[in-house]
């Protein structure tokens, strides 16, 4: 997809997908101004790829291992030097679009840029619990690579990083069923990451840490000001900490059982 703006370095928007037919059209509409849209799909069985084909001819299939590995494989496939990574449940606002185009026209003085995210939970904006959510998503193709982690990996950037003013919209949960399935996957990956740093799960991992997560988000980050949505988010977040360590305990038990006696 060619942009109407040709007086700036060309940009590839990279979108990883898996069964995102409910989200993908709105996402693609928000980035159709880009010089290239690159969709990297990990085996969708719904209409995701069919819808994506209306916006781009570059739809690549790649087996999914984890988010970081998928994106690290996809980044070098971009045709242009600047890459913007957008998830299917995110939207680039017109203001953010114009800011990115203006930045590329002017000539970026950084190798990458952080973007704030405004998160929505069940359609409701969350202004406190996730207030300081940010991610490095706009960067030079040859300067950025995700850390080798199963989940919540950051980009290791070779060069200075700047900030963009306008946020990315993130619609993180449209149904509890999908949200819980997502958290089930994430806590499994997080347990595998934690296994490298936590040799043994102890009682405080299963009690104190989930409780502190709830206190931190609901009280210190003023999640109570987000109403019922804030309470639910903080409760689910605390539960995800519990599940991460419970799954790590399970992994450690299996290793103990596999040891020769």
Model-derived features with residue positions:
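Short, well-formed alpha-helical segments that are part of the catalytic scaffolds
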Residues: 14-33
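Cell-envelope/extracellular polymer assembly enzymes that use nucleotide-activated donors
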Residues: 10-12
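Short, structured coil segments at secondary-structure junctions
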Residues: 33, 54-55, 134, 157
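A conserved acidic beta->alpha catalytic loop
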Residues: 30, 41-50, 87
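Acidic helix N-cap motif at the loop->helix transition within catalytic regions
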Residues: 22-25, 46-55, 95-96
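Active-site acidic short loop of glycosyltransferases
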Residues: 8, 33, 78-81
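Catalytic-site signature of metal-activated, phosphate-bearing donor transferases
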Residues: 69-75, 81-82, 86, 93-255, ...
């Amino acid at each position: 997809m060619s942009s109407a703006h040709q007086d700036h370095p060309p940009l590839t928007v990279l979108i990883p997908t898996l069964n995102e037919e409910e989200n993908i059209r709105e996402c693609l509409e928000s980035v159709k101004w880009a010089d290239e849209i690159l969709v990297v799909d990990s085996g969708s069985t719904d209409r995701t790829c069919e819808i994506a084909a209306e916006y781009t001819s570059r739809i690549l299939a790649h087996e999914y291992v984890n988010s970081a590995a998928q994106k690290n494989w996809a980044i070098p496939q971009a045709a242009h030097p600047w890459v913007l990574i957008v998830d299917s449940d995110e939207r680039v606002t017109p203001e953010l679009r114009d800011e990115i185009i203006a930045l590329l026209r002017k000539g970026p003085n950084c190798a990458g840029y952080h973007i704030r995210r405004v998160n929505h939970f069940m359609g409701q904006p969350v202004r406190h619990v996730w207030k300081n959510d940010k991610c490095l998503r706009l960067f030079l193709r040859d300067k950025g690579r995700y850390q080798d982690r199963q989940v919540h990996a950051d980009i290791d950037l070779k060069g200075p990083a700047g900030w963009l003013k306008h946020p990315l919209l993130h619609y993180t949960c449209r149904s509890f069923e999908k949200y819980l399935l997502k958290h089930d996957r994430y806590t499994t990956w997080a347990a595998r990451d934690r296994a490298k740093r936590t040799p043994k799960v102890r009682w405080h991992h299963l009690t104190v840490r989930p409780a502190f997560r709830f206190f931190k988000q609901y009280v210190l980050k003023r999640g109570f000001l987000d109403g019922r949505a804030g309470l639910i988010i903080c409760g689910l977040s605390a539960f995800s900490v519990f599940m991460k360590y419970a799954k790590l305990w399970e992994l450690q038990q299996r290793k103990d059982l596999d040891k020769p006696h």
